[in-house]
Regions:
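Unchanged
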Residues: 72-96, 101-157, 166, 175
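Short connector loops at helix/strand junctions that flank enzyme active sites
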Residues: 21, 36-40, 46, 60-62, ...
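Acidic, metal-coordinating catalytic segment for phosphate/diphosphate chemistry
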Residues: 2-42
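Conserved hydrophobic/aromatic beta-strand scaffold that supports enzyme active sites
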Residues: 23, 44, 53, 114-116, ...
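Short secondary-structure boundary/capping segments
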Residues: 15, 43-44, 124-127
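A broadly conserved sequence feature marking short terminus-proximal activation segments
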Residues: 1-16, 158-162, 170-176
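Conserved Nudix-box catalytic region and its N-terminal flanking loop in Nudix hydrolases
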Residues: 46-88
Length: 176
């Protein structure tokens, strides 16, 4: 969140000159706080015909399975972010491939970019944000324990296409 360096006065909610949306504005210095969507990056990581899955050790969706994914950091590309998340969550070094899909989740202010990737050397383990990590054959994936709908969508599209062909808009609760 951007905040003015020396905010002395109270923030007010108003529409700034030349803008069309209500935003928080510092009553003293006029600093405008823009709240923008967060970018989530991740990868459907393959090792042969198996998919790398992580069991979450953090909320939301503690104890549910997901692909390695998380918030993109400043100063990194989406591809670098997806590779970093695989290393953090599954101790996995990956080679990023094609973009599978871009998923807009406006209700929670997220844009999710999911890539196809390959595990480089077959090595993986549960990282600090994961309870477990495993390579699953398609029929071994714990379908009833998947953390987020966009994981299912990316997995399904990744298995069919391997690249992005359309943008999906998810209006439902991503925690279900």
């Amino acid at each position: 969140m951007n905040v003015p360096p020396k905010q002395a006065g109270p923030s007010i909610r108003a529409i700034a000159d030349g803008d069309t949306r209500e935003r928080l504005i510092c009553g003293d210095c006029g600093f405008i706080q823009y709240d923008n969507p967060k970018i989530v990056v991740g990868a459907v990581v393959l090792w042969g015909d198996r998919i790398l899955m992580c069991k979450r050790a953090i909320e939301p969706a503690y104890g549910r399975w997901t692909i390695p994914a998380g918030y993109m950091e400043l100063g990194e590309t989406p591809e670098e972010g997806a590779a970093r998340e695989a290393l953090e969550e599954a101790c996995a070094k990956i080679e990023i491939g094609a973009l599978i899909g871009v998923y807009s989740v406006p209700r929670i202010g997220q844009v999710q970019m999911i890539y196809r990737a390959t595990l480089i050397d077959g090595a993986f383990a549960a990282g600090t944000e994961s309870l477990e990590a495993m390579l699953c054959a398609w029929d071994e994936i714990p379908w009833n324990e998947i953390a987020f709908p966009t994981v299912r969508m990316a997995r399904d599209e990744g298995s069919r296409r391997g690249r992005a062909e359309s943008q999906k808009i998810l209006e439902s609760d991503p925690g279900n």
